[in-house]
């Protein structure tokens, strides 16, 4: 959601008061909305050029490398190509003024005369994903997962656990390996508590269900080298998959479908289709 907001806001925010868009202005507008950009190139196709003043663009193409969406989330490579865009410039200017006054960054979908459709390709490296897993937001979510599913491990219903120190490894043939530690909830990381932690390893294949949800294929898992029963592992992975169901974006007027998922050693490539509806 954050990435889509950055790209669309950057594009529409580059419209000048008279309605003209140039590649360099658009590139700068998009660049300014990322935390950091290593490489970025933008190309706008528009024939005839007179359509620009009407808020129409034939096609927009963006290619970037090393794009930091947040201080913890880096995209190794990004390619985006849109279908024709049709924007109400007057409405756009009003939205920009309101956003500036309120200090908020919102999707400017109310300025769209027609839906926006785009193809998006992303590349994430193993190193960047592991950095994200160490972020405060992800750590907080992992604690909730641990409380919800691991509180009754070993028959000790009064003892809650939390997940800490997550690490992912990208393997060949669309497989991943996840390692995480279990510790008693509320414990701080010390030499003594580290010795009591349980190490969980999960390896699984990945596929896409109906274009919107990740499916775990033939998963296996262990806790301190003891196998995890499938009846216990299955529900946990199903719940994890539900957290990444992109149909949740439809509440914001965004329709997205995953067209391809390719996991190789050290990196993951994702191809998606995105459609944004005008908001009245």
Segments and roles (model prediction):
Residues 35-128, 136-193:
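N-terminal beta-strand/beta-hairpin edge segment
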Residues 17-26, 121, 125-129, 133, ...:
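Short amphipathic alpha-helical segments
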Residues 29-34, 133-142, 146-149, 240-244, ...:
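Hydrophobic, Leu/Ile/Phe/Ala-enriched alpha-helical segments that form helix-helix packing faces
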Residues 2-17:
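Hydrophobic membrane-insertion alpha-helices, especially the h-region
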Residues 28, 83-87, 276, 280:
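Membrane-proximal interfacial segments on either side of biological membranes
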Residues 195-280:
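Extracytoplasmic/luminal low-complexity segments enriched in Pro/Gly and acidic/polar residues
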Residues 1-2, 33-34, 233:
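Short, flexible segments with low predicted structural confidence
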């Amino acid at each position: 959601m954050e990435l889509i907001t950055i790209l669309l806001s950057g594009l529409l925010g580059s419209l000048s008061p008279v309605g003209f868009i140039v590649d360099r202005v658009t590139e700068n507008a998009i660049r300014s909305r990322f935390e950091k950009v290593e490489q970025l190139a933008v190309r706008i196709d528009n024939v005839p050029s007179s359509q620009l003043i009407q808020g129409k663009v034939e096609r927009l193409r963006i290619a970037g490398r090393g794009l930091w969406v947040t201080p913890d989330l880096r995209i190794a490579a990004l390619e985006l190509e849109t279908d024709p865009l049709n924007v109400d410039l007057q409405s756009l200017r009003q939205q920009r003024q309101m956003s500036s006054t309120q200090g908020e960054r919102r999707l400017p979908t109310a300025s769209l005369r027609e839906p926006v459709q785009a193809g998006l390709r992303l590349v994430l490296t193993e190193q960047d994903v592991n950095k994200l897993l160490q972020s405060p937001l992800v750590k907080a979510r992992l604690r909730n997962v641990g409380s919800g599913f691991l509180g009754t491990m070993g028959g000790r219903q009064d003892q809650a656990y939390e997940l800490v120190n997550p690490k992912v490894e990208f393997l060949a043939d669309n497989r991943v390996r996840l390692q995480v530690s279990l510790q008693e909830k509320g414990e701080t990381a010390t030499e003594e508590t580290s010795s009591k932690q349980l190490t969980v390893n999960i390896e699984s294949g990945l596929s896409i269900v109906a274009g919107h949800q990740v499916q775990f294929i033939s998963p296996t898992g262990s806790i301190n080298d003891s196998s995890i029963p499938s009846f216990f592992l299955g529900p946990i992975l199903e719940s994890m998959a539900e957290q990444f169901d992109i149909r949740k974006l439809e509440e914001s007027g965004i329709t997205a479908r995953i067209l391809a998922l390719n996991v190789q050693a050290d990196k993951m490539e994702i191809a998606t289709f995105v459609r944004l509806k005008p908001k009245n």
